[in-house]
Amino acid sequence: DHSDNGLIDGCNFYFPSCHKRMLGIIDTPPDISIFSNSKNGTVIRSAFRYTDGSALEMYSDGHTIEDCYFYHIDYTATDLNGLMTTIQMGGAGNIFRKNTMHKLGASATLNPGNEALIEFNNIYDTGHMQSDGAIIQCMVGQQPGVEIRYNWLHDTIKYGARFDGNGEGNNGLMHHNVIWNVEGGIMVKGYDHSLYNNTAFDNGSKNDIIVMIDQGGNQGTSTKNNAANKISGHRSGTYSDYPVPGNYENNWNGYETGTDIKSLLMDPENYDFRPLPNSLLVNAGINIEGITDDYVGEAPDIGAYEHGGEFWRAGISWDLSTTFGDNFHPPNLLYSVEKNPMSFDYKLKQNYPNPFNLNTTLSYHVARSGMINISIYDLMGRNIKTLVNGFQKSGLTSVVWDATNDEGHEVAAGLYFYKMEAGNFRRT
């Protein structure tokens, strides 16, 4: 909080957050990794695994999440922020780059803030715990100035990338993304958006690229140089029934060609989405300033890759297993503490019955004759009743609690703890 220009570099977060449900607390969100009231923070080359709740939240402007690995995030999907996302970024000018994310629970994966840059990410296997949503979710106010480029979005029951909301969003840019095996590749509501050189295929019952006729109408939206099996102005309707609104040029649309885009790609099963030499995609596009300036040949190619151009890859640049390992190993202690050998001889056993109505029995073992204290506490840590406070001989013994406090009044139903203290021994 209030820490501008903070840096997290090379950290391994393994089970970093956990709800308190096992303590009977159900209305308190877990403590997660969060930047609040802080600008220009950077999280780089770090791993986040097994979080109960969202993985990371960064608010205010100018944050960067780069080259990070996220796995098995938000496995309960409770007590999330309002939009229900794995990564929540607020403010403006954020960068989300070269990250790998998979096995995610929340309905939406990334909410990037305003005027964000999202590039070179490999994100898949998302949205297991909630309905609706998209891997990259941009609401109305986040669409002007956002740029989503060079990403692999795949293998999920959600949309790939979506300009969402009530149709008032505008001026968002998506280009050079590859989206496959999702439930709707690109979904665009609003107007004056730009969709260039995206490749999309095998995206379930919904279309690969959806430029909505409804909800904003997409007047002024430019759809050029895209390669997909199904491009339409409707979620699932055909191109002939729902022509793409706005400026629609030089796209390879399976609805028009009647063939599968995969037959024109090098080896899509092994992540090689470059066009085959002499395929119908090569030199079939049009030049778009600032987007296709580095094309090879007579004209830009259609789709996310240029034949003879850069063979870009998405996701982290390092190997998880060699960097952090696949399992958690506690760090070595900076110093050692000599343990009291007697401590291991004291034992505090589980009460019985549990739960109970009238009373319950607490059994315990005293290793050496001496002063013993056993007390009952509530969830707030308040001492409710002292059951034992005095000298006891060694051996196994027990005490009964009748669910009353020190004043003899019956306590409310709920969750309580009991604690035993004997010399250096402490157990709850």
Could you say what each language-model-derived stretch is?
Residues L333-Y352, F356-D378, T386-N389, S398-W401, ...:
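Glycine-centered coil/turn sites that cap beta-strands in beta-rich domains
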Residues T386, F391-S394, S398-V400, H409, ...:
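C-terminal tail/sorting-segment detector
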